[in-house]
Amino acid sequence: MSIGVDWVDGIAVRDRFLAPTQVRALLDCAHLRRERGEFAAARIGSERSLQRRPQIRGDSNCWISAPLLPAELTLLEELERLRLHLNERDLLGLFELELHYAWYPAGAGYARHVDQPQGRAQRQVSLVLYLNEDWAPVAGGELRFFDAPDRHRDIEPIAGRLVCFLTPGREHAVLPTRRERLSISGWFRTRS
């Protein structure tokens, strides 16, 4: 499997980034962490003013941190290979990775936003890996990129699909979903 991604206007979409068995194992990890009560309602704002605003952001998340489950270790190894490749090919200076599961119940979405809030310039590449099996377009939940005031691009959340995009200034949203939607989201960062 090739580790690279091909950028088109600062966005890269890579289907089958992981094998279906690996995606299923990560889906099982997410469900296990939910059963353990490790997910919390997502909040918006800066570290000093975090607040829950479900009409803007309706997901719950769980940060991926130690102790890691075996499938999560495999994912981190694959993402490390990608990070090294991006640094070598694109000279991005990426050193760190932060990741979390994002669970959207039916009806939830995330309004238009950027992933690099003020004071967090270290986030350079955003990534989303979808875990949704048997996804159909009627289910909604697409990742929408705003390319211009009157133009956008939607990407379906299909299992095994990895979406990477250059973080600074990139406005995007998660459209409301009509069924449960699970992904792993995160950022490659420069040094803090």
Residue ranges and their predicted role:
Residues 117-118, 123, 132-192:
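Catalytic core of Fe(II)/2-oxoglutarate
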Residues 19, 106, 179-180:
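Short strand-connecting beta-turns/loops that link adjacent beta-strands
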Residues 23, 106-110, 173-174:
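Short catalytic/ligand-binding loop motif for oxyanion handling, primarily in non-cytosolic enzymes
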Residues 94, 104-105, 150:
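Acidic interhelical loop/turn segments
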